[in-house]
Amino acid sequence: MNRTKLVLGAVILGSTLLAGCSSNAKIDQLSTDVQTLNAKVDQLSNDVTAIRSDVQAAKDDAARANQRLDNQAHSYRK
């Protein structure tokens, strides 16, 4: 009975140690993946910021062009 408990305890302890070693490698890999994803998120955030300013400039240009067209249309109607 005691020997069975000792063997069972040794098997559980060995399994835990082996699982712990593989988990460290997986944790390191996941940590690297998270860092990579964080860098990509930062890059995408910068890209979105740049695109927002480009979109605003395009909207402003379109508004000016529409205003010029409206002014020309009013001058033809007179």
From Swiss-Prot:
A lipid is attached at C21 (S-diacylglycerol cysteine). Its main location: membrane. Keywords: Cell outer membrane, Cell wall, Coiled coil, Lipoprotein, Membrane, Palmitate, Peptidoglycan-anchor, Repeat, Secreted, Signal. One of its GO terms (molecular function) is lipid binding. Transmembrane segments: none annotated. Residues 22-75 form a coiled coil. PROSITE patterns: PROKAR_LIPOPROTEIN (PS51257). It is a lipid-anchor; Peptidoglycan-anchor. Sequence repeats lie at residues 24-34, 38-48. One of its GO terms (biological process) is periplasmic space organization. The keyword Secreted applies. It is found in: Cell outer membrane; Secreted, Cell wall. Residues 1-20 form the signal peptide. A highly abundant outer membrane lipoprotein that controls the distance between the inner and outer membranes. The only protein known to be covalently linked to the peptidoglycan network (PGN). Also non-covalently binds the PGN. The link between the cell outer membrane and PGN contributes to maintenance of the structural and functional integrity of the cell envelope, and maintains the correct distance between the PGN and the outer membrane. This is Major outer membrane lipoprotein Lpp. It comes from Erwinia amylovora.
